[in-house]
């Protein structure tokens, strides 16, 4: 397995993985109506249009096929509150692993890659809106509930964070 930066040619594979996870795993916690709204943002075309604007997006590849994805973006607002002049808080988005490759370290490698890159660009804190299904994974990766509060936000996600320590 290797981790590479996003290229347009990976959009189709990313879309398939994300939408498959949404409709087979996340649907159990959120229902079809919510998943339908979310899934619209993850067609191949939407990924090609929106993902290049993110600070960084990585894909995990096995035999040149996408088996996972994760991306990083600067936080511009936090649930409707504009964050002006933010230069050091970033948000981890769209972490999805192909079902048959879950629990094999792919997600861990992607998060480690995101964290390393975040440190390199001066991030002081990473925020992640985690699905109910993914919450325990991020806890194992050293993330804790934002401001110590374990509650679902308006989107049905737990918000977790991790302070970054720049490695020497």
Model-assigned labels for residue ranges:
Residues 43-59, 91:
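A short helix-loop-beta-strand connector motif used in the catalytic cores of GNAT acetyltransferases and
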Residues 59, 65-74, 80, 91-96:
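Conserved beta-strand in the GNAT
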